[in-house]
């Protein structure tokens, strides 16, 4: 999710190489989760909770879901219930995989990971509240493209 990469860029100094490495790691985790039980999202979330005190489900529940739904529905017309379930599942999976990679690969401290999660929630709130200023997901993607040279292929047509 570009929002997570944007937060890492703004607040933790991640550049192109680290963002791409994180994205690849998350994709590898997703592929491995298909065949390895210890790589399933629920297993990794339990590891984060028990070993590091990071309760991903609790953190996801703190995300202002109504705001996230409105942001998402600006470009994706789905029913509220479909959108809510999709976003909840996506946010849970992404946050679990990202936090696992940030801890194990990038050696971020628990404090830094908790800050990342809080900043992620704050960015969602900002996107929702300040829509009148034109801060949108495609603009976040454009910022990553311009400043970090990271391009999310989902936004190529939107940006051009």
Where does each model-flagged region fall?
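Amphipathic alpha-helical segments that form the core helices of the histone-fold
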Residues: 22-33, 114-127
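Intrinsic disorder/low-complexity detector
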Residues: 1-8, 37-104, 133-160
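Short, highly charge-biased, low-complexity peptide segments
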Residues: 129-131
């Amino acid at each position: 999710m570009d929002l997570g990469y944007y937060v890492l860029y703004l607040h933790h100094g991640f550049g192109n190489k680290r963002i791409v490495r994180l994205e690849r790691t998350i994709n590898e985790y997703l592929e491995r989760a298909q065949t390895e039980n210890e790589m399933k999202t629920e297993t990794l979330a339990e590891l984060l909770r028990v070993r590091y005190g990071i309760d991903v489900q609790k953190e996801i529940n703190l995300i202002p879901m109504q705001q996230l739904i409105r942001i998402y529905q600006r470009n994706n017309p789905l029913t509220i219930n479909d959108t809510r379930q999709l976003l909840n599942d996506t946010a849970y999976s992404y946050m679990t995989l990202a936090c696992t990679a940030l801890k194990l690969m990038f050696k971020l401290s628990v404090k830094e990971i908790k800050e990342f999660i809080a900043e992620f929630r704050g960015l969602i709130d900002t996107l929702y509240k300040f829509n009148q200023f034109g801060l949108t997901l495609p603009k976040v993607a454009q910022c990553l493209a311009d400043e970090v040279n990271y391009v999310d292929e989902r936004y190529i047509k939107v940006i051009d």
